[in-house]
């Protein structure tokens, strides 16, 4: 599909980049943008060449979530969800529009979380609240600036999160922290977000884009087969008891898929490509925290 100027979708080889592009509104998501986001993620999902999907925001800010200015229109049916999607016209219940919007974004969030063949990265600067924060909960990696602003303000608007703010968040930061963030609706910094487990790594604002690009390039250097299988286990084994989860790892052995002969030789000889990859990972990820 054709994407509007509010959502920029770029494909550079195996790397997709989705940019929220309403900086004058902190990149909040209109109904039409949510439809486009769904289609953009779907495009990456079914692209056999896609290996990395990056989410970022224009104008030094990530995403402030829903465009709440549209909420009264949704409730009064002046803004039909059908105008932005292929779903049928809402039923008699005026709240149906909002229900369909939330359902669509829940599907989008689940699709991001379940991208087994594609590694997802959120690059966060500025505002990351509401639905923007919920998008990061679905991603494999989150890079953020120390001064980025995080929060779940829905309760102060008489709303409840619908895209994983209550559900996924508990798995990321625990039940008590999730209650604190959702029920009190206070704002916290990127540094706090890292301490609490929302963020993998903090980077300075000027380094966010190059560090994100370097991480994407590092991911591309890994075995696609091994990444796919590892993501599958990491995604689904965590939802079942450990005894059951162990079964997910049974087929994953050195004989289960294509072997990287050079990689095995490097491991044996402590030299070559494998050692180079480990040094590169350490240089990028472990040795340069701020």
Residue ranges of predicted features:
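C-terminal alpha-helix plus adjacent terminal tail
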Residues: 1-13, 62, 80, 185-190, ...
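Hydrophobic alpha-helical segments typical of transmembrane helices
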Residues: 104, 108, 165-168, 177, ...
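Crotonase-fold acyl-CoA enzyme core
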Residues: 110-225
């Amino acid at each position: 599909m054709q994407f509007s100027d509010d959502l920029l979708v770029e494909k550079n080889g195996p790397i997709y980049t989705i940019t929220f592009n309403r900086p004058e509104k902190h990149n909040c998501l209109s109904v039409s943008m949510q439809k486009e986001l769904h289609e953009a993620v779907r495009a990456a999902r079914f692209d056999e060449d896609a290996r990395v999907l990056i989410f970022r925001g224009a104008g030094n800010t990530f995403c402030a979530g829903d465009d709440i200015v549209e909420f009264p229109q949704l409730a009064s049916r002046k803004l039909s969800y059908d105008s932005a999607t292929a779903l049928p016209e809402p039923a008699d219940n005026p709240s149906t529009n909002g229900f369909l919007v939330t359902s669509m974004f829940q599907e989008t969030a689940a699709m991001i979380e379940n991208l087994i063949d594609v590694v997802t990265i959120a690059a966060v600067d500025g505002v990351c609240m509401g639905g923007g924060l919920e998008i990061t909960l679905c991603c494999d990696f989150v890079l953020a600036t120390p001064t980025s602003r995080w929060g779940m303000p829905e309760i102060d608007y008489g709303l409840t999160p619908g895209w994983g703010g209550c559900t996924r968040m508990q798995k990321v930061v625990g039940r008590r922290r999730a209650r604190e963030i959702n029920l009190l609706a206070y704002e916290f910094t990127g540094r706090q977000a890292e301490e609490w487990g929302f963020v993998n790594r903090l980077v300075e604002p000027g380094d966010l884009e190059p560090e994100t690009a370097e991480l994407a390039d590092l991911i591309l250097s890994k075995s696609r087969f091994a990444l796919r299988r590892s993501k599958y286990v990491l995604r689904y084994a965590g939802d079942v008891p450990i005894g059951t989860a162990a079964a997910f790892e049974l087929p994953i052995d050195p004989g289960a898929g294509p072997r990287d002969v050079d990689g095995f030789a490097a491991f044996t000889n402590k030299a070559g490509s494998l050692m180079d990859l480990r040094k590169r990972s350490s240089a990028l990820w472990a040795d340069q925290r701020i």
